[in-house]
């Protein structure tokens, strides 16, 4: 073998396989990048082009022929052209008969056509073995070698031998083939590169709605109300003070919403007396988004920490502290030290620090590189047991912050309670229901149901 692929980590290194010729139809960015990668890994590459004489920028060592001549050189042909230009393949039906056609194309939008591109290709050339692959790898990644985050290649096809040959090529290129089954899976594979954060939409939309609602709520209480009754201009609070109330409330609410669907699912299973009935679609989607909800919540918690750290350097805080000091000096008064206030203040800060530490720990363990290194019991312990402990600490942090002001009528403005009171509704609800669910009389029944027992079983 004259060349070896530096980036390749193949499972099997068969010399005869590495010397085989691969044909690539199309000389665009992806076709050239894939051809270069194959040349580096020892394959012979033949490009098929409609204008072989005018083709430029191809990797050295590759041969360029017409489509029909190039197809005769190899048993595997990679179709690196768009679906709109597949029609010419019908003219090569006899040449392509019995060959493996690898469809790598993607569409501009999801469900652009009634069938997948691979199925359409199989319909155009019924005598060929069509395999879908390489559509999740970009040309830039192939050229730069930046494949650490995208080494997985989804492969599907109706012919198992053809699919296996393509998967061998994928391995020899240093990538990881993922067998997705028959060609019917091609439609889902083609949707994958076109999706834009599908599991992040609900968390983003929900957090945006919460932030907007809390912003207007705080503006009404802290800006409009003082202006109406006291003629005070508190608009400067919209820069730091109000966001520093919105972010922790949103973080705590989203964290509670991570564990609320699990509580609802447990109640449904107890009510139904079985685990063999499917959850509603909205609950199923909600449970699938829990990781994203938690990470968005962690982001808001980080913002809360950053905004809190800048409080001492704010002009308003320095002015208020200096003005209070001068006033006390003029009046010759001093505030006596309050042990109870010191306890409340230190407890509030300590609970916040511990809660944020566990919050960060939850975020770290949700990373694929970390979650793959622990077993299921360890992962469940961190995400469930420590997760609820995090929720308890963060809720206690907010409760201690409120102190005695929860029941104070002077804290109501236009009969509206402080924003942090709203932020405690969902977390406290989740914790109360969870406390009921972990009681032995309830937990034992729930455990039996999740192990397959049915209340109304006929067997």
Swiss-Prot record:
Keyword Cytoplasm: no
Glycosylation (residues): 323
Binding-site residues, Fe(3+): 217, 307
Transmembrane intervals: 202-224, 236-256, 293-313, 342-362, 381-401, 419-439
Residues that bind FAD: 140, 148, 269, 290, 366, 383
Cofactor binding note from Swiss-Prot or TrEMBL: Can also utilize FMN. Can also utilize riboflavin.
Tissue expression as described in the entry: Ubiquitous. Highly expressed in adipose tissue. Expressed in placenta, lung, heart and prostate. Detected at lower levels in liver, skeletal muscle, pancreas, testis and small intestine. Highly expressed in joints of patients with rheumatoid arthritis and localized with CD68 cells, a marker for macrophages.
GO molecular function: cupric reductase (NADH) activity; electron transfer activity; FAD binding; ferric-chelate reductase (NADPH) activity; heme binding; metal ion binding
Subcellular location: Cell membrane; Golgi apparatus membrane; Early endosome membrane
Gene Ontology cellular-component annotations: early endosome membrane; endosome; endosome membrane; extracellular exosome; Golgi membrane; membrane; nucleoplasm; plasma membrane
InterPro entries: Fe3_Rdtase_TM_dom, NAD(P)-bd_dom_sf, P5C_Rdtase_cat_N, STEAP_metalloreductase
Entry's EC annotation: 1.16.1.-
GO terms of biological process kind: copper ion import; fat cell differentiation; iron import into cell; protein homotrimerization
Alphabetical UniProt keywords: Cell membrane, Copper, Electron transport, Endosome, FAD, Flavoprotein, Glycoprotein, Golgi apparatus, Heme, Ion transport, Iron, Iron transport, Membrane, Metal-binding, NADP, Oxidoreductase, Transmembrane, Transmembrane helix, Transport
Listed cofactors: FAD; heme b
Binding locations of heme b: 304, 397
Pfam families: F420_oxidored (PF03807), Ferric_reduct (PF01794)
Up-regulation conditions: By TNF and IL1B/interleukin-1 beta in adipose tissue. Up-regulated by androgens, including testosterone and dihydrotestosterone (DHT).
Subunit structure: Homotrimer. Interacts with PTK2/FAK1; the interaction may regulate PTK2 phosphorylation.
Family according to the record: Belongs to the STEAP family.
Role summary: Integral membrane protein that functions as a NADPH-dependent ferric-chelate reductase, using NADPH from one side of the membrane to reduce a Fe(3+) chelate that is bound on the other side of the membrane. Mediates sequential transmembrane electron transfer from NADPH to FAD and onto heme, and finally to the Fe(3+) chelate. Can also reduce Cu(2+) to Cu(1+). Plays a role in systemic metabolic homeostasis, integrating inflammatory and metabolic responses. Associated with obesity and insulin-resistance. Involved in inflammatory arthritis, through the regulation of inflammatory cytokines.
Name the record gives this protein: Metalloreductase STEAP4
Organism this protein belongs to: Homo sapiens
Gene: STEAP4
